[in-house]
């Protein structure tokens, strides 16, 4: 009994060819990083000063209320965290793309 196995030829690609990413993807993530950076700066500047920091030295601490945070402040906190996480993820992806292109 003769065992005959015909396999399809295996084509090996170089790892650099399979990992290269087009410049449009890098440009897209770079633009997203700029947008997230500007949005994050705006959101951080919209927060009220909590006191005890640099905002206290320049008069920002006098405006903070004694009561709890309002719904708008809590939503601003949540939006800031989400934009911050998106900013961080964008930086990580850009770093991996730059490493893959080298």
Curated annotation (Swiss-Prot):
Gene Ontology BP terms: protein secretion
Predominant location: membrane
Membrane topology according to the record: Multi-pass membrane protein
Membrane-spanning segments: 25-45, 79-99
Source organism, top-level taxon: Bacteria
Localization in the cell: Cell membrane
UniProt keyword Cell cycle present: no
Gene Ontology cellular component annotations, sorted alphabetically: plasma membrane
GO terms for MF: protein-transporting ATPase activity
Swiss-Prot/TrEMBL keywords: Cell membrane, Membrane, Protein transport, Translocation, Transmembrane, Transmembrane helix, Transport
Residue stretches in coiled coil: none
InterPro entries tied to this protein: SecG
Function description: Involved in protein export. Participates in an early event of protein translocation.
Family: Belongs to the SecG family.
Protein name, per record: Protein-export membrane protein SecG
Annotated source species: Streptomyces coelicolor (strain ATCC BAA-471 / A3(2) / M145)
